[in-house]
């Protein structure tokens, strides 16, 4: 059963602040009331952002965990992309060849003796 924990907690904290304000307002002098009003404004303003921060962290962590599990599942079945492993190897070889050609051209332009990697 899924219970709305955060809204109930937020309501209880807000109700406790309200009760405290009413009691304090009736029992203290005007100078104390002005200072209290400023404090309560800050407290009530800050009361909302921790809730959003916690919710955002929980949701972000959950989404990241789901994505990791999905990636692991796709990796184990070999469905990470539509390309086969042969196509991947071909693309890697092509990229490495391009890098070697570019390195050779750069070394020629800079008059550095080029030594290709043997492997």
UniProtKB/Swiss-Prot annotation:
- The entry's protein name is Putative phosphoethanolamine transferase YjgX
Record keywords: Cell inner membrane, Cell membrane, Membrane, Transferase, Transmembrane, Transmembrane helix
**Source organism:** Escherichia coli (strain K12)
Kinase found in the keyword field: no
The molecular function terms of the Gene Ontology recorded here are:
transferase activity
Segments passing through the bilayer: 5-25, 94-114
* Cellular location(s): Cell inner membrane
Q: Which domain of life is it from?
A: Bacteria
Gene Ontology CC = plasma membrane
What is the protein's membrane topology class? Multi-pass membrane protein
Q: EC number(s) on record?
A: 2.7.-.-
**Family statement:** Belongs to the phosphoethanolamine transferase family.
């Amino acid at each position: 059963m899924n219970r709305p924990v955060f809204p109930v907690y937020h309501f209880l904290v807000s109700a406790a602040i309200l009760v405290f304000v009413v009691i304090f307002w009736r029992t203290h002098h005007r100078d104390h009331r002005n200072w209290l009003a400023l404090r309560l404004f800050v407290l009530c303003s800050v009361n909302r952002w921790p809730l959003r921060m916690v919710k955002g962290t929980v949701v972000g962590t959950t989404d990241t965990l789901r994505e990791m599990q999905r990636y692991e599942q796709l990796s184990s079945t070999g469905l990470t992309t539509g390309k086969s492993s042969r196509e991947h190897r071909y693309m890697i070889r092509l990229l490495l060849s391009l890098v070697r050609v570019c390195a050779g051209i750069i070394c020629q332009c800079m008059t550095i003796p080029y030594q290709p990697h043997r492997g």
